[in-house]
Amino acid sequence: MAKSSVAEQPVSGEKYGFDAIRGTQAGREFYVAMCPWKIIPKLFIFNDYDIPPELRAQRTLRETRIPAIKDYILNNLTDYTFSSLTASVDGSMDFVPFPSSGKDGKLGRLYINMDSRLLINDGQHRRKAIEESLKENPGLGSEMISVVFFQDDGLKRSQQMFSD
């Protein structure tokens, strides 16, 4: 398992900070960060129970899929592969480029207000399988997964991100 310093750090008790890469799609900024598995269950929520199906930005979580993904992780500790989680942030995000990359730099630190809701648009089954895997093997907490963060532009945009 990869050993890495934790990428997330509470900042002033009000924000999370992540080393990130800034990109642009269709005129909108987005950010890619490496997140340790141990924070994934705490950071990301599901909206299945709070919102009627026709208003959800994501598919309903199918609990029957989780054991197979969890087993895939636990049975392939040195040889599993996961694609990125995609998340919407409904609060403030501030990106500060590293000084060495200049004011328009693409490498920097992403700060997300701790009061923000972070909603997974794609990857909720992976997220839940990570949570279940950690219960059986807490040592996986230092494993990393890439997360693509988008500003939450409302339900219609979130549904579009999930369907694409």
Feature locations, PLM:
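N-terminal extension/subdomain marker
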Residues: 1-82, 90-99, 107-110
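Basic- and aromatic-enriched surface patches that contact anionic nucleotides/nucleic acids
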Residues: 77-93, 98-164
